[in-house]
């Protein structure tokens, strides 16, 4: 059986293979002779990093899981300054974390080709917003490439390295959830000899303070350079292999479609049976090439711009048309929604309205049927996995702090604690935000410990923040230092499942593992003690009583308390046991002891436990039970009993 990693490394130019969009990006990086790759995982970009981790050593590429996107960007940047081709990848909100360095470096330029892959998430399938990276790139004057197919996802990477070096500027490769996760045919290109041999590349850094030091005197002359450079990219994109005009030359109407919208437009026109439309396919949404625009607009009377999210291309086209006195009817966001991802239906409706034709399908009728079916479907909210240690931690927190407490939380699997029956998440905003919000609430509601006028005793509001291990290292550290320094009065529970679970079980500083060998493990409790936390403890959440008692004790402490709740992610651990051919414990309900009180369902909420309406007893699905024993600990009647021994 051929593995994906083998395909990504295949030395078979011209061979057609099936790859995920994110895997194709890795192949493109290898064909482009990448030297250094650094990233923090974030859906929908995670498979880029995971695939690179699996092939890097064999290809002679240095690859790391960085602690956050800013660090990853700076790692890749410095490799570029040393003359190596480098790449970083992140989800769209990850660019916010890297923005400080990103914006400054736009003035400074690069040496070796530098690619910043940013995976946007229209419709917010796994994100807190759907910000459009193209708009940020326009703000920063950084060029953007956007693939319309898996083949382009690969080919654009090599091209991006080349133009990045040609003009001395980093390039953004903007993908979306769909282009990241779609599969398609890819014709492989040639691998460089160094990649074939797995020869590690080392750079050479030449000191140049005027370029690399960002004091105002050095930076001031660079702003004109930045503006001149983006215009050079605009000229370059007039002949880019990823931009072209298709359709009849005598067409009176035209459609501009950047990135994946091109594929949707082609499908929409096929549905509508229309072929007398000229199309400008754009693989470079910023900057839009004016020379190509001029050719495209020749002879047209009306133009529609079909793009996801923000009117980035539309605004550029309209400004160009106005500046050149081109009096043509231009439509965009008046027909194409500004929110959520592009779909074939959306493209069909927009194009049909633009052309004044009927859609081939009665979408309203489908909507009405969908509503009726939706009413019949039982609610299926997401849930923490069976045996998830976070469930036990949340249960203990809620019991110790009581529901009257305030529970700021963070970004990770544990965000699901917002749902019943746990309901132990009151706020989330961004990575590391739990500790900052907890501190702010503590100051606003109770006051700092150093203040004379502060609330104490029963007047004091209990605030318990929850944050994951990877998130703690990502952006939790500055917030913890701030809370300790400013004498906050909060409990911070670090839910350490010993892996970056939500994005695909990647390592982090708390695991001590790296793709290129053993790393240095950093223990969260040691960091908390070194920072000066007033109370620090480590618990095993599979022991709910111990966890509850420790949290109760921590809540009595004046100051910042840190409790590390450490137990391996159940999904990750079960995978290990399966690969080792080992079994895990299983629990079942003793019907004679079960009183039907439903505490296991209404307060604990493990998905392996269900209600037998006929017998009015709780049941355990043996195929879902992973044997953590939490149910046996929360049941007041001892109705849950272990029926199979095993490891966990």
Curated annotation (Swiss-Prot):
<comment type="subunit">
    <text>Heterodimer of the IorA and IorB subunits.</text>
</comment>
<dbReference type="GO" id="GO:0051539">
    <property type="term" value="F:4 iron, 4 sulfur cluster binding"/>
</dbReference>
<dbReference type="Pfam" id="PF01855">
    <property type="entry name" value="POR_N"/>
</dbReference>
<feature type="binding site">
    <location>
        <position position="635"/>
    </location>
    <ligand>
        <name>[4Fe-4S] cluster 1</name>
    </ligand>
</feature>
<keyword id="KW-0479">Metal-binding</keyword>
<dbReference type="Pfam" id="PF12838">
    <property type="entry name" value="Fer4_7"/>
</dbReference>
<dbReference type="InterPro" id="IPR029061">
    <property type="entry name" value="THDP-binding"/>
</dbReference>
<dbReference type="InterPro" id="IPR045025">
    <property type="entry name" value="HACL1-like"/>
</dbReference>
<keyword id="KW-0560">Oxidoreductase</keyword>
<keyword id="KW-0408">Iron</keyword>
<dbReference type="GO" id="GO:0046872">
    <property type="term" value="F:metal ion binding"/>
</dbReference>
<protein>
    <recommendedName>
        <fullName>Indolepyruvate oxidoreductase subunit IorA</fullName>
        <ecNumber>1.2.7.8</ecNumber>
    </recommendedName>
</protein>
<feature type="domain" description="4Fe-4S ferredoxin-type 2">
    <location>
        <begin position="616"/>
        <end position="645"/>
    </location>
</feature>
<feature type="domain" description="4Fe-4S ferredoxin-type 1">
    <location>
        <begin position="585"/>
        <end position="614"/>
    </location>
</feature>
<feature type="binding site">
    <location>
        <position position="606"/>
    </location>
    <ligand>
        <name>[4Fe-4S] cluster 2</name>
    </ligand>
</feature>
<dbReference type="InterPro" id="IPR017896">
    <property type="entry name" value="4Fe4S_Fe-S-bd"/>
</dbReference>
<feature type="binding site">
    <location>
        <position position="628"/>
    </location>
    <ligand>
        <name>[4Fe-4S] cluster 2</name>
    </ligand>
</feature>
<feature type="binding site">
    <location>
        <position position="594"/>
    </location>
    <ligand>
        <name>[4Fe-4S] cluster 1</name>
    </ligand>
</feature>
<keyword id="KW-0411">Iron-sulfur</keyword>
<feature type="binding site">
    <location>
        <position position="597"/>
    </location>
    <ligand>
        <name>[4Fe-4S] cluster 1</name>
    </ligand>
</feature>
<feature type="binding site">
    <location>
        <position position="625"/>
    </location>
    <ligand>
        <name>[4Fe-4S] cluster 2</name>
    </ligand>
</feature>
<dbReference type="InterPro" id="IPR002880">
    <property type="entry name" value="Pyrv_Fd/Flavodoxin_OxRdtase_N"/>
</dbReference>
<dbReference type="GO" id="GO:0044272">
    <property type="term" value="P:sulfur compound biosynthetic process"/>
</dbReference>
<dbReference type="GO" id="GO:0006082">
    <property type="term" value="P:organic acid metabolic process"/>
</dbReference>
<dbReference type="InterPro" id="IPR017900">
    <property type="entry name" value="4Fe4S_Fe_S_CS"/>
</dbReference>
<keyword id="KW-0677">Repeat</keyword>
<dbReference type="InterPro" id="IPR009014">
    <property type="entry name" value="Transketo_C/PFOR_II"/>
</dbReference>
<dbReference type="GO" id="GO:0030976">
    <property type="term" value="F:thiamine pyrophosphate binding"/>
</dbReference>
<comment type="function">
    <text>Catalyzes the ferredoxin-dependent oxidative decarboxylation of arylpyruvates.</text>
</comment>
<dbReference type="InterPro" id="IPR017721">
    <property type="entry name" value="IorA"/>
</dbReference>
<dbReference type="GO" id="GO:0043805">
    <property type="term" value="F:indolepyruvate ferredoxin oxidoreductase activity"/>
</dbReference>
<feature type="binding site">
    <location>
        <position position="631"/>
    </location>
    <ligand>
        <name>[4Fe-4S] cluster 2</name>
    </ligand>
</feature>
<feature type="binding site">
    <location>
        <position position="600"/>
    </location>
    <ligand>
        <name>[4Fe-4S] cluster 1</name>
    </ligand>
</feature>
<keyword id="KW-0249">Electron transport</keyword>
<keyword id="KW-0813">Transport</keyword>
<keyword id="KW-0004">4Fe-4S</keyword>
<dbReference type="Pfam" id="PF02775">
    <property type="entry name" value="TPP_enzyme_C"/>
</dbReference>
<dbReference type="InterPro" id="IPR011766">
    <property type="entry name" value="TPP_enzyme_TPP-bd"/>
</dbReference>
């Amino acid at each position: 059986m051929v593995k994906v990693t083998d395909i990504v490394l295949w030395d078979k130019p011209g061979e057609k293979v099936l790859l995920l969009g994110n895997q194709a990006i890795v192949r493109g990086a290898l064909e482009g002779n990448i030297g250094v790759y650094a990233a923090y995982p974030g859906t929908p970009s995670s498979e880029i990093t995971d695939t690179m981790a699996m092939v890097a050593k064999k290809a002679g590429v240095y690859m790391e899981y960085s602690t956050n996107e800013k660090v990853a960007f700076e790692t890749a940047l410095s490799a570029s300054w040393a003359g190596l081709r480098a790449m970083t990848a992140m989800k769209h909100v990850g660019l916010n974390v890297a923005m400080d360095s990103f914006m400054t470096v736009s003035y400074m330029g690069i040496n070796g080709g530098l690619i910043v892959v940013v995976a946007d998430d229209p419709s917010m399938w796994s994100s807190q917003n759907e910000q459009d990276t193209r708009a940020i790139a326009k703000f920063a004057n950084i060029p953007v490439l956007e693939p319309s197919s898996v083949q382009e996802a690969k080919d654009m990477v090599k091209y991006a390295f080349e133009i990045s070096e040609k003009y001395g500027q980093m390039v953004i490769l903007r993908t979306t959830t769909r282009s990241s996760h779609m599969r398609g045919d890819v014709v492989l290109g040639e691998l460089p000899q160094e990649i074939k041999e797995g020869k590690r590349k080392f750079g050479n850094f030449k000191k140049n303070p005027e370029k690399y030091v960002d004091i105002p005197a050095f930076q001031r002359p660079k702003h004109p350079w930045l503006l001149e450079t983006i215009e050079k990219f605009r000229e370059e994109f007039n002949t880019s292999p990823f931009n072209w005009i298709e359709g009849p030359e005598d067409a009176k109407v035209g459609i501009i479609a950047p990135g994946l919208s091109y594929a949707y437009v082609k499908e929409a026109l096929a549905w509508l049976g229309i072929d007398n439309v000229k199309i400008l396919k754009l693989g470079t949404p910023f900057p839009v090439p004016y020379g190509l625009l001029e050719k495209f607009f020749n002879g047209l009377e009306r133009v529609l711009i079909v793009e996801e999210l923000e009117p980035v291309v539309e605004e550029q086209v309209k400004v160009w048309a106005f500046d050149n006195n081109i009096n043509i009817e231009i439509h965009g966001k008046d027909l194409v929604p500004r929110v959520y991802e592009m779909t074939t239906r959306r493209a069909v409706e927009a194009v049909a309205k633009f052309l004044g034709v009927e859609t081939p399908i009665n979408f309203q009728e489908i909507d009405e049927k969908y509503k009726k079916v939706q009413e019949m479907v039982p609610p299926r909210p997401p849930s923490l996995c069976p045996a998830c240690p976070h469930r036990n931690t949340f249960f203990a927190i809620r019991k110790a702090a009581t529901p009257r407490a305030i529970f700021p939380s963070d970004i990770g699997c544990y965000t699901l604690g917002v749902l019943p029956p746990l309901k132990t998440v009151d706020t989330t905003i961004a990575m590391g935000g739990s500790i900052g919000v907890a501190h702010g609430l503590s100051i606003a509601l109770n006051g700092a410990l150093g203040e004379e006028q502060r609330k104490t005793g029963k007047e004091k509001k209990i605030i318990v923040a929850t944050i994951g291990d990877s998130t703690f290292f990502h952006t939790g550290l500055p917030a913890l230092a701030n809370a300790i320094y400013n004498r906050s009065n909060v409990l911070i529970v670090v839910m350490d499942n010993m892996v970056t679970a939500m994005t695909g079980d990647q390592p982090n500083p708390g695991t001590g593992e790296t793709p290129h060998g053993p790393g240095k493990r950093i223990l969260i409790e040691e960091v908390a003690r070194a920072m000066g936390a007033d109370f620090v403890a480590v618990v095993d959440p599979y022991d709910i009583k111990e966890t509850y008692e420790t949290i109760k004790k921590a809540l009595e402490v004046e100051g910042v308390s840190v409790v590390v709740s450490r137990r391996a992610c159940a999904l990750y651990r079960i995978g290990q046991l399966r690969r080792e051919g080992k079994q895990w414990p299983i629990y079942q309900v003793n019907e004679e002891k079960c009183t039907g009180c439903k505490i296991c369902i209404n307060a604990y909420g493990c998905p392996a436990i269900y209600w037998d309406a006929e017998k009015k007893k709780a049941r355990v699905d043996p195929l879902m039970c992973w044997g953590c024993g939490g149910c046996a600990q929360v049941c007041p009647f001892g109705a849950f009993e272990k029926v199979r021994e095993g490891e966990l």
